[in-house]
C-alpha cells in the first residue's frame, strides 16, 4: 500500500500482541495426528473424492496454485466449469494495485457468473480465489475408527494451501447454488469470485467501482465466504495500518555519544503505541467494546541500522491495528497524540504515515437466519471493500450481508492448513439454508 497522510512528529515505544478470543479454540490437525494412507487406502480416498462433485471440485481448485497476483489459472478453470454448468460468466481484469489506469494484468481477473436466464442476481455469493504463499500441494490424511479400522468418511482430512482460505468456501458456494437451481431454475442467484483479497482487496474494490455494482443495487443479499467454523459471523474488527519512522544521526559505535540511535529512539515510541489497547479511553487509549473486546495492535515489521558498529541513523516499523470500536478518524487522532507525546518526551525526529485506503471501523453483519451458532471474529475480510449503494434506502430495504464458511481461521495461512470432509459437506447445507432464507425474504418484499 502507498501512504497518503504524512505527519512529522517525534516519538518512542514497544508492543505485545493480544490473542483472538472470540473464536472457539481449535488446534490445527497436524500430520502426526492422522495416518498417511497406504496404496490401498489412497485408492479408497481418491474414489471418495472423485465420486463427490463437491470434493472433486475442491481438489481441482486447490491443486491450482493461485497466490495473489497469479490467480489466472484458477480463474480460467472456474470460467470453464461454470460455463459448462449453464452460467453466463464475465471476467473483470484487475491490475496488481487496483488502479485501472495502469496496464491490466490478464493473469488476475474477477469471475462474475449468473444463470443465463437471470442476468441481474438478487442474491450474490462471493469468496476470494487468491491465497497467501507458499503453495502447499493438496493431500489427504486418514483418521480411522479405532475399533474397526474402517474409513470415517466425514473425518477425512484435506490439506493444502487454500483448502480453508478460501477455496473451501468457493467450492461449497458453487455446489450450494447448483443444488438450489436444480429445484428452482429461475432463482436469481450470482457468484462473484475476486482476486487480491489477501493483498488489499483489489478485486472487490474493482467490482465495487464497476457497472456491475449498480445504484441502487439489484441484489438484496450478499453471502461472503470465509473460514468461520460453519458459524454465522455477527461482525469483525476494523482495521487501520500505519508506519512509524525515526531519523537519528550516524556515528562510530565506539563513540555513540557523537550520534543519535534511531533504533533506541523508536523502541519507547513503539512501546507507547503498543499500550494504547490497554489504556482507558478517558486517558487517551483506543476503544474496546463488549462485542469485540479490546483494540489490539501488532508491530508486524521493524527495520533499522546498517551494521553493528554504526549508530543507526534510521529505523521504522509497520503496525496493524484491529479496531474494537469507534471510528478510524478517532483512532488516528489517538495514535497521533500518543506519538506526539512520546516524541516530545524523547525529542525524537519522527514521521507517521497512515496507509492509503483509510482503514475501516468494526463491521457489523446480519445473523437473522435461524439454525446457526453465532460468533464475532478479529480478522479482516472483503466485506468493507464492497461498496453497497443502499444508503438512501429505508432500513428494511438495505442489503443483507452474511459471513459464513467451512474451516477454522486458526489453520488458515499455516503449514497445516486443512479441513475435514464433514466441514465441507456441512457448509454446503449451511449455504443452502442462507440462500433459501434470502429467497424467501426477497419474495416478501
UniProtKB/Swiss-Prot annotation:
State the Gene Ontology terms under molecular function. metal ion binding; peptidase activity
Fetch the InterPro entries from UniProt: ArgE/DapE_CS (IPR001261), Bact_exopeptidase_dim_dom (IPR036264), Peptidase_M20 (IPR002933), Peptidase_M20_dimer (IPR011650), Peptidase_M20A (IPR050072)
Sorted alphabetically, the Gene Ontology cellular component annotations on this record are: extracellular region
Which superkingdom heads the taxonomic lineage of this protein's source?
Eukaryota
**Any single Pfam family the record assigns to this protein:** M20_dimer
Kindly state a single biological-process term from the GO annotations of this entry: proteolysis
- Key words, A-Z: Hydrolase, Metal-binding, Protease, Secreted, Signal, Zinc
Per the record, the similarity remark reads: Belongs to the peptidase M20A family.
Could you tell me what this protein is called? Probable carboxypeptidase UREG_07869
What is the protein's species of origin? Answer: Uncinocarpus reesii (strain UAMH 1704)
Amino acid at each position: 500500500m502507498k501512504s497518503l497522510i504524512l505527519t512529522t512528529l517525534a516519538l518512542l515505544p514497544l508492543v505485545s500482541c493480544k490473542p483472538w478470543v472470540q473464536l472457539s479454540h481449535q488446534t490445527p490437525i497436524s500430520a502426526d495426528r492422522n495416518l498417511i494412507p497406504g496404496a490401498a487406502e489412497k485408492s479408497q480416498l481418491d474414489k471418495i473424492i472423485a465420486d463427490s462433485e463437491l470434493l472433486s471440485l475442491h481438489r481441482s481448485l486447490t491443486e491450482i496454485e493461485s497466490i495473489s497476483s497469479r490467480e489466472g489459472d484458477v480463474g480460467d478453470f472456474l470460467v470453464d466449469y461454470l460455463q459448462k454448468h449453464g452460467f453466463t460468466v464475465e471476467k473483470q481484469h484487475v491490475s496488481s494495485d487496483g488502479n485501472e489506469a495502469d496496464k491490466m494484468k490478464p493473469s488476475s481477473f474477477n469471475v462474475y457468473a449468473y444463470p443465463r436466464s437471470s442476468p441481474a442476481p438478487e442474491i450474490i455469493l462471493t469468496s476470494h480465489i487468491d491465497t497467501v504463499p507458499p503453495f502447499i500441494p493438496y493431500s489427504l490424511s486418514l483418521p480411522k475408527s479405532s475399533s474397526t479400522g474402517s474409513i470415517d468418511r466425514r473425518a477425512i482430512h484435506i490439506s493444502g494451501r487454500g483448502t480453508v482460505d478460501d477455496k473451501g468456501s468457493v467450492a461449497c458456494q458453487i455446489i450450494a447454488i447448483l443444488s438450489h437451481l436444480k429445484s428452482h431454475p429461475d432463482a436469481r442467484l450470482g457468484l462473484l469470485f475476486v482476486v487480491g483479497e489477501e493483498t488489499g482487496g483489489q478485486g472487490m474494490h474493482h467490482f465495487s467501482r464497476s457497472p456491475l455494482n449498480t445504484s441502487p443495487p439489484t441484489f438484496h443479499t450478499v453471502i461472503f465466504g470465509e473460514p468461520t467454523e460453519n458459524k454465522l459471523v455477527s461482525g469483525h474488527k476494523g482495521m487501520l495500518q500505519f508506519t512509524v519512522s525515526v531519523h537519528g544521526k550516524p556515528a562510530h559505535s565506539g563513540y555513540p555519544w557523537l550520534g543519535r540511535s534511531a533504533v533506541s529512539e523508536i523502541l519507547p515510541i513503539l512501546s507507547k503505541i503498543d499500550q494504547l489497547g490497554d489504556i482507558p479511553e478517558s486517558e487517551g487509549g483506543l476503544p474496546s467494546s463488549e462485542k469485540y473486546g479490546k483494540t489490539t495492535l501488532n508491530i508486524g515489521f521493524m527495520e533499522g541500522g546498517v551494521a553493528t558498529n554504526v549508530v543507526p541513523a534510521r529505523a521504522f516499523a509497520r503496525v496493524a491495528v484491529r479496531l474494537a470500536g469507534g471510528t478510524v478518524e478517532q483512532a488516528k487522532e489517538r495514535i497521533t497524540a500518543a506519538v506526539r507525546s512520546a516524541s516530545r518526551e524523547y525529542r525524537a525526529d519522527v514521521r507517521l504515515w497512515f496507509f492509503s485506503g483509510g482503514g475501516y471501523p468494526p463491521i457489523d453483519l446480519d445473523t437473522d437466519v435461524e439454525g446457526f451458532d453465532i460468533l464475532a471474529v478479529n480478522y479482516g475480510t472483503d466485506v468493507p471493500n464492497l461498496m453497497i449503494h443502499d444508503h438512501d434506502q429505508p432500513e428494511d430495504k438495505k442489503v443483507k450481508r452474511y459471513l459464513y464458511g467451512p474451516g477454522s481461521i486458526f489453520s488458515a495461512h499455516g503449514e497445516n492448513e486443512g479441513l475435514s470432509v464433514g466441514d465441507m459437506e456441512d457448509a454446503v447445507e449451511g449455504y443452502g439454508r442462507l440462500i433459501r432464507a434470502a429467497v424467501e425474504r426477497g419474495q416478501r418484499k
